[in-house]
Amino acid sequence: MKKKISLETLRDLGIDTELLMTKNRPEAVDLKTAVTEQLLRRGYSKASIARMLNQDHRIVDYYLRRHNDLFYTDRTYTGVHNLVRKCLTPQPPLP
């Protein structure tokens, strides 16, 4: 059974939710892109991700699995990787 995750829990995981919810700032766009790419790779639907990213500062019912693959290795995402590294804390893999 997957666990529902709130904005507070995302913050506890090290995700800069204030920046994530900011509009019209390049860093926010890059962070949203990085988070979206990670969640798409994990099989979440674009609609679910869009709902989560477009919420205000209310609690969000959202599923997020903790993995140790939070950082990109693809050179295409080098700039985003650097930003994400500052905003996210790697999590140990689930047993």
Where are the regions a protein language model picked out?
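Short, Lys/Arg-enriched anionic-surface-contact patches
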Residues: 2-32, 62
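Residue-level recognition of short, structured coil/turn motifs
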Residues: 14-15, 54, 72
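Short, amphipathic alpha-helical "recognition" segments used to contact nucleic acids or chromatin
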Residues: 27-44
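Amphipathic alpha-helical interaction surfaces
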Residues: 39-45, 66, 70-73
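Short alpha-helical "recognition helix" segments of helix-turn-helix
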Residues: 47-52
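Helix-turn-helix DNA-binding helix
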Residues: 56-61
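Short Lys/Arg-enriched helix C-cap and helix-to-coil transition segments
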Residues: 69-95
